């Protein structure tokens, strides 16, 4: 890619495995700068190292969606890597325990609400100014099991 093309920057949560990992790899291999985010440092280390070795731009920055009190700071750290974000992909979620509604425990329900609803909403708000300035996009990925 040449000229004045500005490589788009994508922050993706839940990028350790599955859909998030595949999306992140595909974006990096297609010229995006990708911030892979898992719950803790080194969750995405192997993927990022392989992409960088192959000549793509990828970094890791942990964002623990279940810890709302540190979410803003973790998001700011991720954004500081390349200074902004163009695409936010909210992919991280919890789906356990998978049980009938009458058997679910309060702490499990609270965690699901915190990780699957509150954290993605807060991430959008923390990235909003950058997304607005860059005419960015938000993609929310949900499974029926996380609802």
Question: PLM ranges: what are they?
Answer:
Residues 62-74, 106:
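The beta1-alpha1 cofactor-binding region of Rossmann-like NAD(H)/NADP(H)-dependent oxidoreductases
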Residues 124-125:
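A short, exposed helix-loop element centered on a Lys and neighboring polar residues
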Residues 16-17:
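Conserved glycine-rich cofactor-binding loop
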Residues 137-147:
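Catalytic loop of short-chain dehydrogenase/reductase
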Residues 30-46:
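Conserved glycine-rich Rossmann-like NAD(P)H-binding loop of the short-chain dehydrogenase/reductase
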Residues 91-97:
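Conserved NAD(P)H cofactor-binding loop of Rossmann-fold oxidoreductase domains
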Residues 99-101, 105-110:
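Substrate-binding pocket helix/loop in short-chain dehydrogenase/reductase
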């Amino acid at each position: 890619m040449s000229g004045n093309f500005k490589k788009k920057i994508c922050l993706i949560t839940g990028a350790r495995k599955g859909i998030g990992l595949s999306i992140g790899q595909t974006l990096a291999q297609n010229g995006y700068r990708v911030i892979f985010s898992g719950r803790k440092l080194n969750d995405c280390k192997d993927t990022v190292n392989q992409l960088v070795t192959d000549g793509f731009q990828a970094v890791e920055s942990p964002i623990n969606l279940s810890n709302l009190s540190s979410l803003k700071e973790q998001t700011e750290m991720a954004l500081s890597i390349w200074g902004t974000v163009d695409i936010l992909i909210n992919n991280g979620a919890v789906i356990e325990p998978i049980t009938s509604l009458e058997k679910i425990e309060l702490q499990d329900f609270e965690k699901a609400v915190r990780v699957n609803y509150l954290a993605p909403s807060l991430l959008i708000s923390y990235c909003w100014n950058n997304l607005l300035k860059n005419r960015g996009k938000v993609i929310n990925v949900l499974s029926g099991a996380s609802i």
